[in-house]
């Protein structure tokens, strides 16, 4: 029975000592993997950032072109003098001669349709 105890004790000691070595080795492997993972994540993050910046630049460029081409010119509001030939009244307004002609300085004003 002593030989069984000695054999069991020997196996136990070997298992504990080898287990500790594996634990340290595993810890070192995990540290290496996390360091590699961090560098990979940094690379992926930089790549994603570049793509987002390119996309943002493209969108801003489209917006500026769109606003430049479709920008409404300044218009004249209701009750403001306008030129009969070059009517810049806002939408929904028309350049008309007022009914009481002698009161106003100009002869045409923007009125609602």
UniProtKB/Swiss-Prot annotation:
It is found in: Secreted. GO terms for cellular component: extracellular region. This is U11-theraphotoxin-Hhn1x. GO terms for molecular function: sodium channel inhibitor activity; toxin activity. Expressed by the venom gland. Transmembrane segments: none annotated. Keywords: Disulfide bond, Ion channel impairing toxin, Knottin, Secreted, Signal, Toxin. Residues 22-74 form a propeptide. It comes from Cyriopagopus hainanus (Chinese bird spider). Residues 1-21 form the signal peptide. Probable ion channel inhibitor. Disulfide bonds join 75-90, 82-95, 89-110. The lineage of its organism: Eukaryota, Metazoa, Ecdysozoa, Arthropoda, Chelicerata. The presence of a 'disulfide through disulfide knot' structurally defines this protein as a knottin.
């Amino acid at each position: 029975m002593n030989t069984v105890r000695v054999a069991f004790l020997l196996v136990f000691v070997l298992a504990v000592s080898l287990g500790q070595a594996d634990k340290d080795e595993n810890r070192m492997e995990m540290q290496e993997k996390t360091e590699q993972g961090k560098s990979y994540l940094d690379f992926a993050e930089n790549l994603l950032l570049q793509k987002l910046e390119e996309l943002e630049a493209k969108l801003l460029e489209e917006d500026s072109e769109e606003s430049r081409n479709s920008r409404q010119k300044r218009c004249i509001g209701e009750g403001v003098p306008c030129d009969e030939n070059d009517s810049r009244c806002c939408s929904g307004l028309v350049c008309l001669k007022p009914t009481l002609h002698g009161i106003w300085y100009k002869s045409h004003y923007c009125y609602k349709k």
